[in-house]
Amino acid sequence: MEQKPSKVECGSDPEENSARSPDGKRKRKNGQCPLKSSMSGYIPSYLDKDEQCVVCGDKATGYHYRCITCEGCKGFFRRTIQKNLHPTYSCKYDSCCVIDKITRNQCQLCRFKKCIAVGMAMDLVLDDSKRVAKRKLIEQNRERRRKEEMIRSLQQRPEPTPEEWDLIHVATEAHRSTNAQGSHWKQRRKFLPDDIGQSPIVSMPDGDKVDLEAFSEFTKIITPAITRVVDFAKKLPMFSELPCEDQIILLKGCCMEIMSLRAAVRYDPESDTLTLSGEMAVKREQLKNGGLGVVSDAIFELGKSLSAFNLDDTEVALLQAVLLMSTDRSGLLCVDKIEKSQEAYLLAFEHYVNHRKHNIPHFWPKLLMKEREVQSSILYKGAAAEGRPGGSLGVHPEGQQLLGMHVVQGPQVRQLEQQLGEAGSLRGPVLQHQSPKSPQQRLLELLHRSGILHSRAVCGEDDSSEASSLSSSSDTEDTEVCEDQAGKAASP
């Protein structure tokens, strides 16, 4: 006898009735329906609070396959289509069953027919591959909306006011007029020969070693580099309005930071070099052995990280202004005025960043962190070596002075100034093993000759003849003023 294909009888859905008791009633694990535990309290915003399933009348949970249904009818319809079960469904009562939330599991055929009758769409049920593709599309749409929202938020951020634009233009012009070689530095730079500064060869009195040839090259550019920082500051009205004493303290504190920033933004990843003063391209070891020690690592790392920001001249200029107007310097008189000036530059800086609309997420806070890195990495790197003669950075004393960390500040410089006569000439014999002159003595003489050590030079009151003459009494008085300010700045 030919056996008829088995049919699924009414109420025998294997997925919905797998946990039935002998009396035909559905068991509930742990006394609670899993569906209700997972969906409890969830109502989509487009549904009314007590909206019912159009198939069985149970509480609806959403819009499924073009109809508002409960989770049970949604799952039943999906399984039926995915597994192609509807040809096997049958009804004992001539397809006349009433489907509600109590009887819905007793006749699969009538339940399926009602799903079709109320408008549930079979073509919206996806197989596994289509479902994966749909989820991918959903994720893409979410990402697109996220980007659109970010663009809208950027467009809504405030841009510079007319007053801030004036501040920005002045700072930008001050930077461009004092930035050696400008945007043409790559074409005009000269690489320091590889045989210079590759190995520390001369022992200094403090036990460190330095390549004097590299040091000699650096001393040729240090005076104009410091002078350009001073000129930049003097072109800012907010700085020029400060007392002369505060101007000197601010310049002493920021000189190394600004010169390091100017070198860092001229980092070239192809040659792995920094271009100092817009003209001399040096490698890490050359900078380190030429007198800068471990700080060279901090400047190179800063250059690498800043290269991703693609800063323009205005952003570099405003960053320098923020570094200049720092109230962290000891001995300041007009702290409130300086703090307000820094806040004005910070606000203009933030609004200008909004104006440029960088593609880097969270560009502004990241850039602020870099500003703090300029200070912390340069000023406090190697703090464990604070007791050494080279100061808190673990750098040779001549290296610290070479790039303006102290300018006229700290016991190293004061000790050297005691070796200078009133006319600026060196006292005492020059040791033969220290080259014709000690690097410290050479640098100090350079700073005296350039007028960097004189308060009148900083405040714009110097006479050209007085600035060039170290033998005049006025220069000696100015030097004493700077020494006094340096002592205040160095003391806590």
From Swiss-Prot:
Gene3D superfamilies noted in UniProt: Erythroid Transcription Factor GATA-1, subunit A, Retinoid X Receptor
Protein localization: Nucleus
Gene Ontology MF: a single term: protein domain specific binding
Keywords: Cytoplasm, DNA-binding, Metal-binding, Nucleus, Receptor, Transcription, Transcription regulation, Zinc, Zinc-finger
InterPro entries: NHR-like_dom_sf, Nucl_hrmn_rcpt_lig-bd, Nuclear_hormone_rcpt_NR1, Nuclear_hrmn_rcpt, ThyrH_rcpt, Znf_hrmn_rcpt, Znf_NHR/GATA
Binding-site residues, Zn(2+) 2: 91, 97, 107, 110
Entry binding sites for Zn(2+) 1: 53, 56, 70, 73
Region (Disordered): 1-33, 457-492
Any one annotated GO CC term: nucleus
One Pfam family in the UniProt entry: zf-C4
Binding annotation for 3,3',5-triiodo-L-thyronine: 228, 277
GO biological process: animal organ morphogenesis; cartilage condensation; erythrocyte differentiation; female courtship behavior; hormone-mediated signaling pathway; learning or memory; mRNA transcription by RNA polymerase II; negative regulation of DNA-templated transcription
Zinc finger (NR C4-type) boundaries: 53-73, 91-115
DNA-binding region location: 53-127
Chain ranges of the NR LBD domain: 163-407
Region (Modulating): 1-52
Keyword Transcription regulation in record: yes
UniProt tissue specificity: Ubiquitous (Isoform Alpha-deltaE6).
Top-level taxon of origin: Eukaryota
Assembly, per entry: Binds DNA as a dimer; homodimer and heterodimer with RXRB. Interacts with NCOA3 and NCOA6 coactivators, leading to a strong increase of transcription of target genes. Probably interacts with SFPQ. Interacts with AKAP13. Interacts with C1D. Interacts with TP53INP2. Interacts with PER2. Isoform alpha-2 and isoform alpha-1 interact with TACC1, but the interaction with alpha-1 is much weaker. The interaction with isoform alpha-1, but not alpha-2, is decreased in the presence of thyroid hormone T3.
Purpose of the protein: Nuclear hormone receptor that can act as a repressor or activator of transcription. High affinity receptor for thyroid hormones, including triiodothyronine and thyroxine. Isoform Alpha-deltaE6 does not bind DNA, inhibits the activity of isoform Alpha-1, and stimulates myoblast differentiation.
Similarity comment text for this entry: Belongs to the nuclear hormone receptor family. NR1 subfamily.
Entry note about domains: Composed of three domains: a modulating N-terminal domain, a DNA-binding domain and a C-terminal ligand-binding domain. Isoform Alpha-deltaE6 lacks the hinge region that connects the modulating domain and the DNA binding domain.
Protein name: Thyroid hormone receptor alpha
Native source organism of the sequence: Mus musculus (Mouse)
Gene this protein is translated from: Thra
